[in-house]
Amino acid sequence: VVGCKPKAEVPVQFAEADIEVNIYPDYKDIVVPPNIAPLNFIVRDSIATAYVVQFTGKGQELFAAAADDAVIRIDTAEWRSLLMENKGNDVSVDIYAKRPNGWIHYKPYKISIAEEPIDAFLSYRLIEPGYELYRQLGIYQRNLTTFEEKPIYENNREYDDNNNQCINCHNYRMGSTESML
């Protein structure tokens, strides 16, 4: 461990754990497009204090690590390279956790990389839980190849009794999303 963040390399000694890793979001055994943003995740292991993740595909390896916050953040450039080189193939994911008795290796899982890219943008309305009235509400656009999110339209940043209106969030112009991009 270097500073607060462990070094991203496979531990020299570890025990094989005959259990599946619990991650959030659950990205185990899924198919992803080759241009998707890095699939950062949290490892849920209440007694572990450090984590190392190894992605392996077609002669390439990508490593990521986390301390006791368990948040795995994947380098964007390395992620893009790994996915582009593995279109139509699987990438194996091995996760190691440092527990009080030493490192363990969870059962590996795979991520299949599709040949086809995903459309870059998704638009959606973002509303507060229990939404009943025209309050703070907006239509947003997210770039699925990055983490960039932009408002297309926001009703109100703050509640205003005299200035609330429908923003037509159920309909796109002439039923088409083409003009949203």
Regions found by a protein language model. Name each.
Residues 4-181:
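Sequence signature of WD/YWTD-type beta-propeller architectures
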